[in-house]
């Protein structure tokens, strides 16, 4: 009996250690998600201050404060409603960087707003569009749609599209082979980050698909998530 108890106790210890490791990995990857974003924000704040544009400076600091609060909450999961609020907040920051250059349309059905998902899941791809496609003085469109699939009402489909130049073929090849994602502009850490977090949280129950839209030629990303992930993973 003592040996059985020891074995059961050891199993519990191993399980709890795995949970702690996964939480640590999730938090580490979450914090790594967008380091350049903060540098860009500080540059905008500096420039607005130098130009004496105090109203825009106040807006920028408010948006950045909202973003920091969201990313520092420490949750491995959050509602899609909060994620979409974060994306909208992020795009407001970028619209201060690139006035009249970013147009975003969002469609989110009411029945998915409470579904749990990894933070920065959608923003990562909006950020890719801003980083690689947006040019001052030229309009770039971003479309974000979130809804349940017709085939399975317990699966949520997230679609992020733009009308830029699309994913380089080298990036698509790396994604298909599950390799680190490099192209001539360097490593695409954000996409790899999302892929790893999805695997840690959902394993085969989630899908990440990246391709180029045939109509616009822009990058298109689809993410499929189950809506019934265990909520205690959030803690």
Regions found by a protein language model. Give the residues of each.
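Two-component histidine phosphotransfer core
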Residues: 1-210, 218-220
């Amino acid at each position: 009996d003592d040996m059985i108890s020891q074995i059961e106790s050891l199993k519990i210890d191993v399980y709890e250690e795995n949970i702690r490791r996964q939480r640590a990995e999730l938090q580490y990857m979450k914090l790594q998600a967008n380091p350049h974003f903060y540098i860009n924000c500080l540059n905008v704040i500096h420039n607005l201050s130098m130009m004496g544009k105090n109203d825009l400076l106040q807006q920028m600091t408010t948006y950045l404060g909202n973003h920091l609060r969201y990313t520092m909450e420490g949750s491995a999961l959050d509602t899609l409603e909060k994620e979409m609020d974060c994306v909208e907040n992020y795009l407001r920051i970028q619209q201060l960087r690139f006035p009249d250059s970013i147009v975003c349309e969002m469609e989110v059905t009411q029945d998915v707003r409470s579904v749990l998902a990894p933070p920065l899941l959608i923003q990562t791809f909006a950020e890719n569009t801003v980083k690689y496609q947006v040019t001052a003085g030229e309009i770039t469109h971003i479309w974000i749609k979130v809804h349940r699939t017709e085939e399975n009402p317990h699966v949520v489909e997230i679609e992020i599209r733009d009308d830029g130049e699309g994913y380089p073929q080298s990036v698509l090849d790396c994604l298909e082979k599950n390799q680190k994602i490099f192209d001539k502009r360097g490593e695409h850490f954000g996409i790899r980050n999302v892929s790893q977090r999805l695997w840690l949280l959902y394993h085969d129950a989630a899908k990440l698909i990246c391709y180029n839209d045939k109509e616009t030629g822009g990058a298109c990303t689809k993410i499929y998530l189950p809506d019934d992930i265990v909520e205690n993973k959030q803690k």
